[in-house]
Amino acid sequence: MSNKLFVLVFLAFLVGCGGGGGGGTDSAAPQPAPDPQPAPPPAITQLSFLTSNNAELDADISMTIDENSIMGRVESNASVDSLVATYQFEGTNISIDGVAQQNGISASDFTDLVNISVENADGDSRAYQVDLTKYTGLPVVYLTTENNAAVESKEDYINGTVAIDGGRYFDDLPESIIEIRGRGNSTWVLHPKKPYQIKFENKTEFLGMIEDKRWLFLAEYSDKTMLRNRTVFEMGHLSNLEYTTQGVYAEVFLNGLYNGTYNITQKVEESNNRVAIGDEGYLLEIDQDWRLDPDDVFFYTDEFDGPGLVNIKEPPGISYGTPEYDYIRDYINDFEDALFGEYFTSDAWGYKSYIDVPSWVDWFVINEITKNVDARSFASIFFSVIPGEKIKKGPIWDFDLSFGNTDYADSQYREGWWVKYNPWYERLFQDPEF
């Protein structure tokens, strides 16, 4: 009897605990839903341009992603103004400059820097900048000769064309008719990478440089940094010299073959946009006999490196024995007589009555700082004369062997003077006022 009573009491206890009252818990009641998980951070993990979507490409391009920058290169002849990108990304959608993109379908212009944004389901976004560089990023110049003829002479032009893909920073130039020949002296004879000169029929703007007919392609073979000429040109632009050449680096193809990186520059010549001396002015260069062209007209002076050869670069067509020739020969020799004469410091009778002193100072400072080996007495020492005016020094030119880039002269050393021992400057330094 006691056992039955115990069982009944135990069952009653269980019923009381189970629940009909307000204080119990129903074990079958639904559990609350967990908090939603945040979407993965938006990110582009791969960006490619596939030949299957871009017929103009010769090979697939897989871009490099570095934080928020996406970079890559494409061949120089590829068109990038309508490319289809393929993405691998974390997120729900991608846009370019606010325009939604269909992965592997939408075409966009990648000529300039492009801003891409990827967004996830939570509305978070991440921005990237895409830099698809054509070739090296420099403008590309295409030179083509008639019948793909080789450029073998620096005296005789051959017919051809030039075209420019200016890339991101320069204007394109459609195929244009030119003439082309070699240029230079030792740079033409000794080096496998040849320098060139091209000539348009009409004045033409070239790589952002003010229009003119003739343009030089400096190979810079002796200067493996390719920095010396351009660095010194910048020094010239900072000086008070009236004119200093401009230049632009470019990749050059000749008859479809890559020729290398060139420094494309203005030519040192008479022009309203270059050496502005007019039709009656003279552009002169200290030079060497063996460097002369057959049609060059020149004269000697008595004192410059005994004697000094002065090549008359302008005006064109000047002839020996003409009044124009006699004038400039006599004027430069009269200057030398005044410079080396007894009263050379006299304002009225000395060198100051012949030369524009500030230009002579600036020319010297630039050439001495850079230890330009040619500038002491060898070549590329330019100066100009307009009848009735004083002799102006410049433009500066030819610095591929400056800044110690020689092993045969003391100009290779940082210490000491070099250009100061130019005969004219050596005498000028004897005047404390100079």
Language-model features, listed with the residues they occupy:
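C-terminal motif of bacterial Sec signal peptides marking the signal peptidase cleavage site
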Residues: V15-G16
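Phosphate/dinucleotide-binding and metal-coordinating scaffold of catalytic cores
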Residues: D35, S125, D131-F434
